[in-house]
Each structure stands twice: as C-alpha cells, then as structure tokens.
C-alpha cells in the first residue's frame, strides 16, 4: 500500500495522554479521534485499535505506544497513548515521543492518584512544557462540589511541581459518553480541542533554533584545513558564520569557511542534514568526536546535573543485578561515551533493573548540554539505562 503523502499545510503539534491507570486515557484518545473526525473530517480510530498498541524499540528499550493523528481547523496533531505505566516512564525518559503538551486525565470519581503525581513529576523532569487537564467520568458524579474539590486538588498538585496550576485549562467531561455520541459530552471534547489550540503555543521548528552540530568525525584536508562532519541537530550554519567548539576541552571560537554535502560545496547546512563544515585556522588535533559545533553563546559545557533515569530490565538486555552508589558507568551523549559517577537520592541504597530513579551525575569531562538532553548509560558498549538531563548543577 502506498504511503499517504504528508501534507504540511497546518502547524504540526505533538501531544499525548498521561495519568493514572484506568482513569480513561485510551477512551479519551478514542473520543478525541471520533469527535474531531465527525466534526472536522478525518479518519476515526476506535478504542481497540488504540488499546492494541504495537511494540516499539527505542535505544533497545521495549515500549508499547499507540500513535494517532487528528486535525482541528488550525492544526494537525500527532497524539501518543501508552497502555501501561512502565511504557509512559520509558517513553518520557527516552524522548521516544516528544510532547509539546500533555493531556492529564484524572477520573473525577477518584481524584488524583499515585500515578497522576508520578506522571506530573516526570513531565516536569523531562521538560513537557504544557499540561491541560481533562477531568473524566464527570457523568458519574452528581455532586457539583465534589467536582470542584477534585479540580482544586489537581490544580494544587500541578502547582506543587511548578506548573501554573491556577491558570491552566481544566475541562470536565466524559470520554465514554462522548464516544457514545451524546452531544453535551461531545461538546466537551471540542472544548478540549480548543484548549489544545489556544493553550499550547506552536512549537519552534528545529531549523529556527540556534545552530548545533554534534561532531562525529574530524578530517584534515591539505591546503584547506580541518573539516568536521556530523548531522546538524538544529538551526542553520552558513559560510562565514562564527561558531564555537564546545565540550570536552576549553571552548574555542572559529569561523565556518565552507559547507559540503556529498562532496558538493554549499552555502549552508540545515537541521537534519549530514554535512562537513570547514573550520578556519583550526588544527586537526584541536577538535574531537564528542564535541559540538554551535552558534556562539547558545550552549555551554557542564559536568554535574540531576537526571531522571530508566534502568533497563534483564529482559530488555539490561543488567541482571542492582547497582549501588559509587557506580561508575559510561554516559553516552550524542556521539560519545564519558565516564561519570552517580549519587542516589537520600534513603535509596540500590537501583534494580526495571526501576526509574532520579540521580545526580558527575562526568569526568564537560559535555555541551541543555536541560532536556537525552543520554544512554552503558557498560562496555552495552546499553543498561536511558536518561534525560532534568536540571544542570555545574
């Protein structure tokens, strides 16, 4: 079957459902798909299609995720839904499904539950920028005051994790009733879609961000100088641009004197392209794999950071035994491994395969990093964990 052509006319936004088990995340996903298809056109996916999530592998980690798409008049959305709690943890930490915003589903019959809190914390740690709340199962609660109480509780919980709990949209609805086609509840799904459109800003495209290229290889071309190669992660580099070489050693400045792709000379290299960048006056030994080429001042080297980490289970090819404080694995950032030590949270003695944990990492040499950068934890070339930089310390 031929693939449908992807029409990029409208802005594209990535969202997903998060929240406690059985609060109705998948039912809501199906309801959004149905109501928006019915209202604005498009293909509706039913509950069983979404619930039967295919298994994916991201950096060797098994994750079950459902991807659906839907449209509002002004935007195209890609929406992820996961069947199990562990899938959410892995998904958010590996960045397998980056979210520009999340829909937090809370059953009004239960109020916030342990995984509600954990998903909010994870969203904070991995940098999900916006959360919208959908209070589900409101058809089962007759008491208006009870609904207000649950809403207050959810807002307070979000504020506790530095989300704007008082200001973010909370929609009270019933995913099941909307799916059954009851107009008053379908209207709530449209209200949710409007909130997605108005509350989540249009994400900045990679090409509009400051230039960054992780260096994979360094060559010396006689008579021309030093060329670094890699895939441009974000932004654009033009011939004549001043750039910085960041990470591992002291940051140095140089100028891009040429860009080439497949042996052809170009004026610029753009996000997503594999290219070689010729650097003025830079010696072959001044640059190495693991450094990045970046727009001056846009990124700094750091060694110590707080991270959220998922430790692979034995079945995923991870460790068979726990690790303890003083553990010294390799941390793989972009193109290179760096040794580092870990500090576990107070009261945590050991970490078991399959756990997710907050830890402070100190690397033996600095790496160019921003909050939100993903990394792998490796032992002898084998991946044993995945993590994300939550907060830079030094």
UniProtKB/Swiss-Prot annotation:
Q: What is this protein called?
A: Elongation factor Tu 2
Localization per Swiss-Prot or TrEMBL = Cytoplasm
Pfam families documented for this protein: GTP_EFTU, GTP_EFTU_D2, GTP_EFTU_D3
- In this chain, the stretch annotated as G2 covers 60-64
What's this chain's function?
A: GTP hydrolase that promotes the GTP-dependent binding of aminoacyl-tRNA to the A-site of ribosomes during protein biosynthesis.
List of residues binding Mg(2+): 26
Domain annotation tr-type G: ranges:
10-204
Instruction: Kindly state one GO CC term assigned in the UniProt record.
Output: cytosol
Q: What is its main location?
A: cytoplasm
User: What is this enzyme's EC?
Assistant: 3.6.5.3
Give the source species: Shewanella baltica (strain OS155 / ATCC BAA-1091)
Keywords of this protein's UniProt record, alphabetized? Cytoplasm, Elongation factor, GTP-binding, Hydrolase, Magnesium, Metal-binding, Nucleotide-binding, Plasmid, Protein biosynthesis
State whether keyword Transmembrane applies.
no
Instruction: Please tell me where GTP binds in this chain.
Output: 19-26, 81-85, 136-139
Does the record's keyword annotation contain Cytoplasm?
yes
* UniProt region (G5), positions on chain: 174-176
């Amino acid at each position: 079957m031929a693939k449908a052509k992807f029409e990029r006319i409208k802005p594209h936004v990535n969202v997903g459902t998060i929240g406690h088990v059985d609060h109705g995340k998948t039912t809501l996903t199906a309801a959004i798909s149905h109501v928006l298809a019915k209202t604005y056109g498009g293909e509706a996916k039913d509950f069983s299609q979404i619930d039967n999530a295919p298994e994916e592998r991201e950096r060797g980690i098994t994750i079950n995720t459902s991807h659906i798409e839907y449209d509002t008049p002004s935007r195209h959305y890609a929406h992820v839904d996961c069947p199990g709690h562990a899938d959410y943890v892995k998904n958010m930490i590996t960045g397998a499904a980056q979210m520009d915003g999340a829909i937090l589903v809370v059953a009004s019959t239960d109020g916030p539950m342990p995984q509600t809190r954990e998903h909010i914390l994870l969203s904070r740690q991995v940098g999900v920028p916006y959360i919208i709340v959908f209070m589900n199962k409101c058809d089962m609660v007759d008491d208006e005051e009870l609904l207000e109480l649950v809403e207050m509780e959810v807002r307070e919980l979000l504020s506790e994790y530095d989300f704007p709990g008082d200001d973010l949209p909370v929609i009270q609805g019933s995913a099941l009733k909307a799916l059954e086609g009851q107009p008053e509840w379908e209207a709530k799904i449209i209200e949710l879609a409007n909130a997605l459109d108005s509350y989540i800003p249009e994400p900045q495209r990679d090409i509009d961000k400051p230039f960054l290229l992780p260096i994979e290889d360094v060559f010396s071309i006689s008579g021309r100088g030093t060329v670094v190669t890699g895939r441009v992660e974000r932004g654009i580099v033009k011939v004549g641009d001043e750039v910085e070489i960041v990470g591992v050693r002291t940051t140095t400045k140089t100028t891009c004197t040429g860009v080439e792709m497949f042996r052809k000379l170009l004026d610029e290299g753009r996000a997503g392209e594999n290219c070689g960048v010729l650097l003025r006056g830079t010696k072959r030994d001044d640059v190495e794999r693991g450094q990045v080429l970046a727009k001056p001042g846009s990124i700094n080297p750091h060694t110590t950071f707080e991270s959220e980490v998922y430790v692979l289970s034995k079945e995923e090819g991870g460790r068979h035994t726990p690790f303890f404080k003083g553990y010294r694995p390799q941390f793989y950032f972009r193109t290179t491994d760096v040794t580092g030590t870990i500090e576990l949270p107070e009261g945590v003695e050991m970490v078991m395969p399959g756990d997710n944990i907050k830890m402070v990492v100190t690397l033996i040499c600095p790496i160019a990093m921003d909050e939100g950068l993903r990394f792998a934890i490796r032992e002898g070339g084998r991946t044993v964990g995945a993590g994300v930089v939550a907060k830079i310390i030094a």
